[in-house]
Amino acid sequence: MHVNNEIGSIQPIQEISKHLKTLKDKVYLHVDAVQSYAKINFRPSRYNIDFMSVSGHKVHGPKGIGFIYVKENNRIKPILTGGGQEIGIRSGTENTPGIYGLGEAIRIINEDLDGKIEKIKNLRDLLQKEIMENIEDIKINSPEDGVCHILNVTFYGIKGEVLLHYLEQKGVYVSTGSACSSKKKGSHVLNAIGLSPQEIEGAIRFSLSDLNTEEEIKEAVKIVKESVSDLRMIMRRR
């Protein structure tokens, strides 16, 4: 996993790749780039990546479609055989609208990609600054050198799940962790970085896009501040 989808930490793929080269046996490097593609500008060939997976919905493309990068001369044994579609890797009727939509989304997002990444980073910095200046008793869980679009924050004294639904009613959409493991108890990621059960319980994740604006960030923080204040007041009455 290139980028952790809960807190945004970036894994040292280049260093991992260099280490694999020193091993006696050939080890293939597959990178889950779902959270890093178009959020970090990199070329898989320069990182010596053998295989890389990307999901369309993370780049404003259709859901249910993605692509895999395969380094030249590498081979994948197909799971489905028969018709020979998708250059013999995955037989079956091709999702033509999804493929076209994904291709178009990738074309659009790669137009001035560096500019888009810089904009998202500035929005993330603004979000963090506004939260820290306007809301008391919080903890930033994302690393300073993390990916540009993820900010994980703990709000002490309330439950993240309750805050999530409270914000949802007001048009602000956040998450309490990975969509892949939202039904599990607690977050193993937040636990691994040393957060207490109470800090884990009060954590939510903000995810940003180049389509967001500074005005939206400031309005969202205003709503979060009001919501956190309301929920803390309710908790104190119990």
Over which residues does each language-model region extend?
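Pyridoxal 5′-phosphate
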Residues: 1-238
